[in-house]
Structure formats: C-alpha cells, structure tokens
Amino acid sequence: MKRLKFLVIYLIITIIVSGCSNIDNVKHPKEAYTPKSLTVGFIPSQNAQILNAKVKPLQQLLSDELEVPVKVHIATNYNTMIEGLKSKKIDIAFISPVSYTLAHDAHAADVLLKSKGYLVDNKGNQTHHLVDYYRSQIVVRKDSNINHLKDLKDKRVALQDVESTSGYIYPLASLMEKGIKKSDIQIQQVKGHDQGLIALLNHDVEAVATYQDARADLKKDDPDIYQETKVIYRTKKIPNDTISVRNDMSNKWKKKISRAFIDISHTKKGKHIISDIYGHQGYEKAKDSDFDTVRKYRDIVD
C-alpha cells in the first residue's frame, strides 16, 4: 500500500514538472517593434558628402512629424544597408527595388512606399508626367562606334554595385537576354551614377549604365553633356525606389511612417527636400508583389 501511494505521488510530481517544463518551452511570438528613435538609411547615388548635406533637412522634418529623435545613416553600399536592416541598426531605408527584394526575401524588410517622379525626355528636360517607374540606359560617347548592345563585347563598361537595379541588374540582364555574357564585357564598378558618366567623359570607360536620365544631374557642370554622349539602349520599366522598414516594425508605426512621408511630400518645403535628395516627387503605397519582375531580372543575373 505504501509502495502504491509513493508511486502515485511520484507520477503526480512527474506530470507537474513535465507540464511546467513544456510551458517554459512554448515559443511566444516576438512583440512588434515600437521605436523610441529612428535611424534612416540612404545609399549614395552621388557623392556621399553631398548626399549627407541634402538629407539633414529631411531628418528634422521626420523627427517633427513622428515625434521621436531621427538620425540619418549613409551606407557604403547596398549590402551594408541590407545588413543594417537585418541587424536592426537601420529602421527605415531608402533602397532600390533589387535591394528591397533581397532584404524582404531574407526576412529583414517590408516595403511601405514607392516613389513617384517626373519622366525626363531624351534631351534631359523634365516632363509633367508623374509615374511610379523609371528605366535604365546605356550611354556611350557621341563619337563612339558603339551603336548596339552587341557592340559592347570586349568593351570597358562602368556599372554600379551588384545590387543596383538600374546601374547593374537591369542593364546586365538585358545584355544576357541578347546573348552577351558577363565575361564578354570588361566591367568596371563605380560608386555613383554621376561618377560613371564622368568616367565615360574622361575616356576611362567606353560605356556606362545609369538610370534615365542621369545626364541631367551633370548638365549644370557640363552643359554640353547631351551633345557629347548618346544613349544606345533603354531597358524595360523598373519600379521606382522604395521606402522600406525593418520587418518587425509594428503595423501602427508602419502606418505612421508612411503617413509622415506622404504628408511631408505634400508640403512645399518637404517636396523640395525629397526632390533634391533622389528626385522623388511624392510617394504611393506599395506591396511586395509590385517587385516580382525585379526578382525575375535578379535571377537572370544570378
């Protein structure tokens, strides 16, 4: 009888302990992130020091709108931006479509907005047509005998970082679709679309891939740039750049951040600032499926 009592007590204790252990091992979902301050990341499409000066006014506007301290971070390249999102050191990122897809597929970022901008005509003049896409272009010197993509074989071509949508992925994928392999051209990587054009004008490269139309950015310093160069190819439409956030950001703050950027873009001061940084003229809501074509081109290059 005593032995039976002892066995019953032992079983009860075992069940209780086991139950407590199972409770401890239950994985509770992580709480959504509610920021006390925000770090906004930017990628240089021009000289980093110039960009840093341009983003400072936006820093203050965002802080006023969101009522939290905001600081800016100029990432060295797309990879460091994605790593910043993964490590939660960057909360909001101005990133290209390709970088967004890489960050999202790595469970590091969610897209909030894509930018809107005015189309630029073939002479570098801004039209009044506001769109949510742009194109990449391949530019050569006017006196060059390069007139088609096939002519780029064995030529020195300036490209951006490997995660750049218009400066690497789309132009390279376009070449590959035409049967020109990566090894068929001499790739020279540059930092900044303006630097690629300068390398072209200085005869350091024979062609350069830029967004359409990066030449307009150099028009002030080189009024003859359109007479000195020609475009031999323009790609298919590319979704505009994104404003994305770390993937654990709370829905409340996602909405708050989206609203802040849209509201800022509707003010005269705010519109001037965002236009000065990347040429953005406003923002619209975006969803992940908007970037499926970007994934397709990314896979071609990979």
Kindly give the residue locations of the regions a language model identified:
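Extracytoplasmic small-molecule ligand-binding "clamshell" domains
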Residues: H28-T101
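Bilobed "Venus flytrap"/periplasmic-binding protein-like clamshell domains
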Residues: P35, V40-S63, A75, V131-L197
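A ligand-binding cleft/hinge motif common to bilobed small-molecule-binding domains
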Residues: F94-A108, A173-E177, L201-N202, E206-Y226
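An extracytoplasmic/periplasmic, membrane-proximal ligand-sensing/linker region
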Residues: S21-N22, A32-G41, Q46-S63, V245, ...
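Short beta-strand->loop
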Residues: A109-V131, Q186, K219-K237
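Hydrophobic residues within well-ordered alpha-helices
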Residues: L85-K86, L152, L200-L201, I257
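Acidic, polar ligand-binding/catalytic clefts
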Residues: E83-D151
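C-terminal motif of bacterial Sec signal peptides marking the signal peptidase cleavage site
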Residues: I15-G19
